[in-house]
Curated annotation (Swiss-Prot):
This is Glutamate--tRNA ligase 1. GO terms for molecular function: ATP binding; glutamate-tRNA ligase activity; tRNA binding; zinc ion binding. InterPro entries: aa-tRNA-synth_I_cd-bd (IPR045462), aa-tRNA-synth_I_codon-bd_sub2 (IPR020751), aa-tRNA-synth_I_CS (IPR001412), aa_tRNA-synth_I_cd-bd_sf (IPR008925), Glu-tRNA-ligase_bac/mito (IPR004527), Glu/Gln-tRNA-synth (IPR000924), Glu/Gln-tRNA-synth_Ib_cat-dom (IPR020058), GluQ/Sye (IPR049940). It comes from the Bacteria. Catalyzes the attachment of glutamate to tRNA(Glu) in a two-step reaction: glutamate is first activated by ATP to form Glu-AMP and then transferred to the acceptor end of tRNA(Glu).
């Protein structure tokens, strides 16, 4: 196989869509698998809709996903004169022409076709009227440059996913190459840039299939070899309809804020339309080793499954090193608190127990608040009701037990509290409920036998002793 060069070419007119992220991932993995190049091109020729904010967001999202590109970022706007020059070459060779038909005139033709229930393919009266068009151009009449599309025969796309796709050339219109303001259109710019960048394979959504037919016709007119085409089915919502905001988060930045890990999101997107045997968990490194376009599925759209996405994220959280998770959690909590070194150390120590119960980083950070010494505990309704029903004297005895332990570790705490529950003729769970409520403000938490040694005697006793204040304030929620 020749040296592979792929590209991802987003327009900075919005945030990176989850479908765009999958497209970028597939292009990246295919290039890396074949030891080729993966390039990033920002298609910023739509000045009215392109913004710096969106550009930065797209770049940041790709970096977060660890989809790293080769070479410098290519900006389409930097190549405008090259695009226009190619259009002028096509005019010179008789494969494009100056068109003076106004948008209003075209709209009238379109409305007439609709009235007559006919499909509308614009064929300009200037298509073969070269002498008159040159005369009008020289008189500064407004014009566009249109491609002289073939008007007979077929254009065939041999697509790696869609198979052979045949377009009747009569259905390909004379697309605009250069607008009346002198700027090139997307359809021209993308062909010129892909050629100049040496792109060998284009992997993108199958909503670009019609564009592909027009682009291949343009490649033929220019005498250039077209890249291999790989049009993948789009991502649909769980209900089988086109993905939209009503399905929930669709931007990569939203998933990052929700607490997804990039490794989990990439793993999930990888399996949307590509598979390797029955493997579900595929690391970044293994994906590079395995990925090829032969593994891309059929023509049916992939559906988002939020439950599976959440499951995968939970798996990756539990598989991630505690120190890495602690750093991420501390970063989240630092937006709310000025954390002391002691709190950071407690979060690090407690991470094993915390991560076993979390599927999102945001949940993990919320659960880690039990180790944030700079914040007062927030008690849920059920925890307060348990505390109100618990005799203060029982907790006073627990405080004495904790205070008298020579060594504070999981085993010593478990043994001491188990023996105490027996002397009180209580089930161990009955004793753990109020202790958990006082130490964590919740009815669910990591093992209390783990929480107590991590908090240490001073902080454990301080929280347990708070029972009197809670009961005297009658902090019961109904």
């Amino acid at each position: 196989m020749t040296n592979i060069v792929t590209r991802f070419a987003p327009s900075p007119t919005g945030f990176l869509h989850i479908g765009g992220a999958r497209t970028a991932l597939f292009n990246y993995l295919f290039a890396r698998h074949h030891k080729g190049k993966f390039l990033l091109r920002i298609e910023d020729t739509d000045a009215a809709r392109s913004t710096e904010e969106y550009k930065i967001s797209i770049i940041d999202s790709l970096k977060w996903l660890k989809i790293n590109w080769d070479n410098d970022i290519f900006y389409q706007s930097a190549n405008l004169q090259r695009h226009v020059n190619i259009a002028l070459e096509l005019v010179k060779s008789g494969k494009a022409y100056y068109c003076f038909t106004s948008p209003e005139e075209i709209d009238l033709q379109r409305q007439l076709a609709i009235t007559q229930k006919q499909s509308f393919i614009f064929r300009s009266p200037w298509r073969n009227n070269i002498p008159s068009s040159l005369s009008l151009k020289n008189n500064n009449k407004a014009y566009v440059i249109r491609f002289k599309a073939p008007d007979y025969g077929t254009t065939i796309i041999n697509d790696h996913v869609q198979g052979e796709v045949v377009f009747q050339n009569q259905q390909i219109d004379d697309m605009i190459l250069v607008r009346s303001d002198g700027t090139p259109t997307y359809m021209l710019a993308v062909v010129v840039d892909d050629h100049d960048m040496g792109i060998t394979h284009i992997i993108r959504g199958d909503d670009h299939l019609t564009n592909a037919a027009k682009q291949i016709a343009l490649y033929d007119a220019l005498g250039w070899a077209a890249p291999a085409m790989v049009h993948i089915p789009l991502i649909y919502g769980p209900d089988g309809t086109k993905l939209s905001k009503r399905h929930g988060a669709i931007g990569v930045d939203a998933y990052q804020k929700m607490g997804y890990l990039p490794e989990a999101l990439c793993n999930y997107l990888l399996r949307l339309g590509w598979s390797y045997q029955d493997e579900e968990i595929i690391s970044h490194e293994r994906a590079i080793k395995l990925f090829d376009i032969d593994g891309l599925g059929g023509k049916s759209a992939a559906r988002l499954d939020f439950d599976k996405m959440l499951y995968l994220n939970g798996y990756y959280i539990r598989s991630t090193d505690n120190s890495i998770l602690a750093k991420l959690v501390i970063e989240i909590l630092s937006k709310q608190y000025i954390l002391s070194n002691e709190s950071c150390n407690l979060i690090q120590k407690g991470m094993s127990g915390l991560k076993s119960r979390a599927n999102l980083l945001t949940d993990l950070a919320e659960n880690a608040k039990i180790y944030v010494l700079e914040s007062q505990l927030t008690f849920i309704n059920e925890a307060l009701n348990i505390i109100q029903k618990t005799p203060s004297m029982l907790i006073t005895e627990v405080i004495d037990i904790i205070n008298n332990l020579q060594e504070l570790n999981c085993e010593s705490v478990k043994q001491a509290l188990t023996e105490f529950a027996k002397t009180k003729k209580m089930k161990l769970g009955q004793l753990m409920d109020p202790i958990r409520a006082l130490l964590t403000g919740n009815t669910k938490s990591p093992s209390i036998f783990e929480v107590i040694p991590i908090l240490g005697k001073i902080h454990t006793i301080k929280r347990l002793a708070g029972i009197k204040a809670i009961k005297s304030n009658n902090q019961t929620l109904v």
